[in-house]
Structures are given as structure tokens and as C-alpha cells.
């Protein structure tokens, strides 16, 4: 077990490049870090252990030892974890880069074997080639990878993942890319590696190689917002941001393949890039479709639809003295956009409901209450039209000129009044709404705050470091709430 970790430890003194690349946290002094009780493979040292969340991508893929290095497979610094990472599609050329990297960093030849033999022979009772003392030489070259599926793109992190574990809570799945390369050619490469080993170790090497190289691939898992840590989320002025740490270098490469070519042919450039790299802190916005869905689900769960039959003049989120309508505590850590959407939706539905249904106060039990919750839950799904129609029908619509309409003569907020006029593109509001107008207003309120067609599926922490740098230079890495405030002040 942990052959990759042992190989990094023993091979780190072979060359100058090895000293820089094979310095992993699992072989350093342990610094206590809280565990998240998620068992899986650390993609940096490849050992099977309890994982914690990465500082760079907020996903659970790093062990309690390697977390101290603050490395992520999305960095642009050419450390070992980055060199083992490739984005889809996986080609034979990329797989050859992985094989060449393993052969460069972890060679097996008579000189290496004699070097390790001398080190081991310095200690008594270790004269034989026992597996426990020569585990670093039992490093077969396989093409297994931990795959992160970020909606439309996939990132493969190659490594020697030994053992078995339940992958239910892991953000990645282990796949075998041997069929994308050449089984017989990979077998030949490993036979040549093991030919220099003593006979007692050859059988162990061969057994380990065939066991790992013939593993079936797991079914890929789509990463969802629930897979990301909330520990690095901050809430400033009801705006959620995520703190992301990435390792940067000033050197650039056209592709990952060209980076590997420099590892083989231009080692000085790699060493310079490693020695001049720095750790950069990004404060990225957390506005994405996954978080919006999670917030809307929570909002629908805590929603108090009794507000639509009440006589409260305050916005729905500000009611605090009413046992049937109080949701004030829900918005303590919720996005300001969600609160504004909730207020406008419930104020509009309240005005429509009070205009058409003879209802007393917020303690009443109404058939429309479940539909209000459903409307929130379905506000960004394909079922929104059906839910709006059901809500419209419980407001006792009447038929006028062949169309079902509801009355509208209840007081509303000035800002909401102006917003509805903009949605309907009219100078004055009518005293009756058709189903199409009612639907347009509700959808317009939702889309003003959350236009799902423009949202990314996942947080920005899943993007490559180069893209984060570019977004920061363009001023697009944070939410535009402060810009909106500045614009409104300038208009006044």
C-alpha cells in the first residue's frame, strides 16, 4: 500500500528535479488538520486515508498531511500533482506523457537498485530483498486516474491508486485508461522495468501491475454544489464569496503536452518555475446554478405562505412579530438577491390574492399555501408554468372577453410597481391580469435576480488558475453588487 508515497520519499534524492517535484506533504512533518470522515485516495500522495477539503477547489481530495502544501490539480505551477493532471479528451499522446514522467522520476535500473540496496544494508537484518524495505521499487506504470467531472469537462489525475474503498462521498471516480493506449505496449514497458529487479521482487511487481492495470473503470460522477466545502465561504454584506488559494508561476505553456516536453528536455525552466512560484489568494463569487438551487430549496422549505393572506405592510422578509409570517432568521446568511426575490414575489402574490379571495388574516388556512411553496421550488425549473397556472386558478379568475382574468387593486410597493410596469412594458398597470400577464410578472421577478441562462453550473473554484487570473484582470471574479450600488448613487 502507498507505493506512490514511498517512491516519492526514496526517489526524492536521485536528481535535482526529483528533489523539487517529489516533495509531498505525506512525507513531511504532520500538522494537525480536522478530518471530514470521508475515506478515499489522496490524489497527491495516492494513499487510501481520510480526506479533507482542498484550499484550491473546495473538494475533498487531499489527506491531512498533504493539505499543508496547499496544492491543487488546478494550479498552474508545474508541481507533481499538476504534471499528473490532464483535461479531457484523453489522447494516446497525453498518456505517453504520463508514462515518460513516471520513467523519468521513478526509474528502475541496476544503478538505482544498488543504491537502495546499499542504504538498506546499512541496517542489520535487512540483507534480503524483502517487500517492506523495497516497496519503492514495486512501482508499476499504470494508467489509472481519478476523474473529476465538472459538467461539460473532465479532469484526469493519474496516479497509483491501491486498495479499495466506497466512493459514495468522493467527488471523483477511478477509471482505467489502458484501452486508450495499448495493453501490449504497456505490458512491455512494465516487463522491461521489472527485468532489472531481483527474482523475489519480480513476482510481487508483476502481481501488483496486472492487478492494477486490469481494474474496470467506475461510472463517472457529476460533481454537484453539495460536494463543495462551505468552510471557505464568507458572507460580506449578504454577498457570498469563496476564498481560493492557488499556486502561480509567471511561466506559461501552450498546452499540458508542451509542459511535459519541457520536463523531459528543459529541466532548468521547470526548476526556475518551481522556485519562483507564489501562493495567490482569490476571492471568487459563489453565484452559480448549483448554489441558487440549494438556496431556493431552503427558501421554499422555510417559506411562510401565510403572508399572502395577511395585512402586513412590511416586506415578507422583515416581518418579525407574527408567528405565521416570521422568516427573518432565514435570511441572516442568505444572499441578498434571494431576499429581494422573495419579497417581490410574495408582495405581488399577496396583492393578487387579497384582490380576488375573501380572506381575513395570516392565520387563515388557504389552499394556495402549498402552491406558493411549489412556485418557489419550481421557479427555475421547467415545471414553473404549471405551478403558476395552478396558483392563478385558486384566485377565482373570471372570464372576460373569452379570457380568464384576476382582479388587481391592492396596494403594492413603489419599487415593485415600477418593476411590474417594466416587465409588462406599459405606462400604467391594468386592474386585471390575464394568465399570460400573471406568468410574465412572476418569471420577470425571478429572472431579474437569477437569470439561470447566464449562470455557470458550478462555482468558479473549478476553473483553471489561468482563467481565474484573467477574470480578476477583467474585474469579473466578484459579484457586481458594489458596482450596482455605485451606479445608483451616480444616477441620483
UniProtKB/Swiss-Prot annotation:
InterPro entries from the UniProt entry: Rotavirus_NSP1 (IPR002148)
Region (Important for cytoskeleton localization): 82-176
Region RNA-binding: start-end pairs: 1-81
Location relative to the cell: Host cytoplasm, Host cytoskeleton
A GO cellular component entry from the record: host cytoskeleton
Any GO molecular function: metal ion binding
Domain comment in the entry: The integrity of the zinc-binding domain in NSP1 is important for degradation of host IRF3. The pLxIS motif targets host IRF3 for degradation; however phosphorylation of NSP1 pLxIS motif is not required for its activity.
Family: Belongs to the rotavirus NSP1 family.
Physiological role: Plays a role in the inhibition of host innate immunity by inducing the degradation of key host factors required to activate interferon production such as IRF3, IRF5 or IRF7. Associates with components of cullin RING ligases (CRLs) including CUL1 or CUL3, which are essential multisubunit ubiquitination complexes, to modulate their activities.
This protein's name: Non-structural protein 1
UniProt organism field: Rotavirus A (isolate RVA/Cat/Japan/FRV64/1989/G3P5B[3])
Origin organism lineage: Viruses, Riboviria, Orthornavirae, Duplornaviricota, Resentoviricetes
Amino acid at each position: 500500500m502507498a507505493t506512490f508515497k514511498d517512491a516519492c520519499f526514496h526517489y526524492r534524492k536521485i536528481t535535482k528535479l526529483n528533489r523539487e517535484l517529489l516533495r509531498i506533504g505525506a512525507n513531511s512533518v504532520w500538522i494537525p488538520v480536522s478530518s471530514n470522515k470521508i475515506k478515499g485516495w489522496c490524489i497527491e500522495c495516492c494513499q487510501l486515508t481520510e480526506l479533507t477539503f482542498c484550499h484550491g477547489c473546495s473538494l475533498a481530495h487531499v489527506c491531512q498531511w498533504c493539505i499543508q502544501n496547499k496544492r491543487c490539480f488546478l494550479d498552474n505551477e508545474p508541481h507533481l500533482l499538476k504534471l499528473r493532471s490532464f483535461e479531457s479528451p484523453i489522447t494516446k499522446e497525453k498518456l505517453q506523457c504520463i508514462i515518460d514522467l513516471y520513467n523519468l522520476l521513478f526509474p528502475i535500473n541496476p544503478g538505482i537498485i544498488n543504491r537502495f540496496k546499499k542504504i538498506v544494508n546499512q541496517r542489520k537484518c535487512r540483507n534480503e530483498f524483502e517487500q517492506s524495505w523495497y516497496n519503492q521499487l514495486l512501482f508499476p506504470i499504470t494508467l489509472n486516474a481519478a476523474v473529476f467531472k465538472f459538467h461539460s469537462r473532465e479532469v484526469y489525475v493519474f496516479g497509483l491508486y491501491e486498495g479499495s474503498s466506497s466512493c459514495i462521498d468522493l467527488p471523483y471516480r477511478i477509471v482505467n485508461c489502458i484501452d486508450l493506449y495499448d495493453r501490449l505496449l504497456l505490458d512491455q514497458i512494465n516487463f522491461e522495468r521489472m527485468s532489472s529487479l531481483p527474482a523475489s521482487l519480480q513476482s510481487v511487481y508483476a502481481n501488483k501491475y496486472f492487478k492494477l492495470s486490469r481494474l474496470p473503470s467506475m461510472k463517472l460522477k457529476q460533481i454537484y454544489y453539495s460536494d463543495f466545502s462551505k468552510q471557505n465561504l464568507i458572507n460580506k454584506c449578504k454577498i457570498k464569496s469563496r476564498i481560493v488559494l492557488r499556486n502561480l508561476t509567471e511561466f506559461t505553456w501552450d498546452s499540458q503536452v508542451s509542459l511535459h516536453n519541457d520536463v523531459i528536455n528543459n529541466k532548468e525552466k521547470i526548476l526556475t518555475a518551481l522556485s519562483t512560484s507564489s501562493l495567490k489568494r482569490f476571492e471568487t463569487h459563489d453565484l452559480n446554478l448549483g448554489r441558487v438551487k440549494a438556496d431556493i430549496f431552503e427558501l421554499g422549505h422555510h417559506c411562510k405562505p401565510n403572508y399572502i393572506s395577511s395585512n402586513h405592510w412590511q416586506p415578507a422578509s422583515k416581518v418579525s412579530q407574527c408567528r405565521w409570517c416570521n422568516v427573518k432568521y432565514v435570511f441572516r446568511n442568505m444572499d441578498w438577491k434571494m431576499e429581494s426575490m422573495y419579497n417581490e414575489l410574495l408582495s405581488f402574490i399577496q396583492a393578487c390574492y387579497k384582490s380576488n379571495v375573501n380572506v381575513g388574516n395570516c392565520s387563515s388556512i388557504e389552499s394556495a399555501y402549498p402552491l406558493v411553496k411549489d412556485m418557489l421550488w419550481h421557479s427555475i425549473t421547467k415545471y414553473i408554468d404549471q405551478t403558476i397556472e395552478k396558483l392563478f386558478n385558486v384566485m377565482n379568475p373570471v372570464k372576460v372577453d373569452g379570457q380568464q382574468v384576476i382582479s388587481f387593486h391592492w396596494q403594492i410597493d413603489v419599487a415593485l410597481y415600477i418593476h411590474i410596469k417594466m416587465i409588462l412594458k406599459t405606462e400604467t398597470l391594468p386592474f386585471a391580469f390575464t394568465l399570460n400577464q400573471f406568468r410574465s410578472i412572476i418569471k420577470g421577478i425571478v429572472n431579474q435576480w437569477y437569470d439561470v441562462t447566464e449562470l455557470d453550473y458550478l462555482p468558479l473554484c473549478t476553473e483553471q488558475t489561468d482563467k481565474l487570473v484573467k477574470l480578476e484582470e477583467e474585474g469579473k471574479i466578484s459579484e457586481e453588487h458594489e458596482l450596482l450600488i455605485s451606479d445608483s448613487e451616480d444616477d441620483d
